[in-house]
Amino acid sequence: RYPMKLINGKYERISWDTALNEISAKMLDLKKASGPDSVYFVGSSKHNNEQAYLLRKFVSFWGSNNCDHQARICHSTTVAGVANTWGYGAMTNSYNDMQNSKVAMYIGSNAAEAHPVSLLHMLHAKETGCKMIVVDPRFTRTAAKADEYVRIRSGSDIAFLFGLLYHIFKNGWEDKQYINDRVFGMEKVKEEVLAKWTPDKVEDVCGVKEAQVLKVATWLHENRPGTVVWCMGQTQHTIGNAIVRASCILQLALGNVGKSGGGTNIFRGHDNVQGATDVGPNPDSLPGYYGLVEGSWKHFAKAWGVDFEWI
C-alpha cells in the first residue's frame, strides 16, 4: 500500500517519505500561523490501546487537547455518568461473570443482535436459575429470551428505574449496611423517589403498571447478586447521563456493586471504544482519566520524560 496525492484532479502514488514530509510541513505551517488548536485530531475505536495512547500522547506534544473519537456519540454519557457516581467510567464486571448472577435486567440493550457472544453467557446463567428481565420499547430478539419483558415508552428509563426504587425503599429492601458503609447521599435519593415517583406517576410517564414494576423490584430484591445491562438504548438521549446514573443508583441501593454476579455490564458500541476512551484521544482527559489539571500534566511530563513547562 502506498499513499496517494491528488494532482490535477487525479490521485497519483507517492512515496511514504514524500507524504510524511509534505504533511508534516503543512501541519507546522498551520501551527505557526494559527496555533496548535488549528488542527483537529480524530482517533478511532478501531485503534488498539497502544495506538490510541500514542495518538493522545502525540496531540499532547503538539500542544493541544483538540482531539476526540467515536465515544463522543457512543458511550461518553456512560463514562461521565458512571464516573460521577462511583469514580470510574467503565463496566464493573465481565461477560463470563454474568453466569454468577441470580437476576439480570437488560435496559437499553439488544444483546442478541448487537452483542451475541455476551448473550451466550446469559443463557448459561439462565440454565442455573438466573432470571432475565428485558426492558425495551420494542420486543426484540433479546426480549424473546426474557423471563419478564417490560415495554416502556422511549426515553422514560428514569421513571421506570425510580419506580423500582420506590418499591425497594417502601418495603425496606435496600441493603442498609452496604449503603451505610459505602454510599453517600442515598437518603436524598430516597426522599425524592418516595415523594415524587409514586406508582401512578411512574405509570403516567413510562406506561408500566404498578403490578409489573413491583414484580421486577421483587425479583431484584429476592435474587441477589443481580446485574444491570445497558448499551445505546440508554446513552442516545439528551438525558443519557441521568439515565446512566439512575441505573448505577439502583445497583448501589441493592448493594450489588463490587460483587461477583452484580455490578453494571455496559456493552459498548464499537470493538475498542472502551480501550480508546481509557487511554486515548479524549479532549477532556489524559490517559487513565487523569483530568486536565496541573498535577496530571506533571505526572505525564515525568512519565514521558519531558519538561513540565514545555508540555
Where are these regions (language model features)?
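N-terminal export/assembly segments and adjacent metallocofactor-ligating motifs
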Residues: 1-171, 182, 189, 209, ...
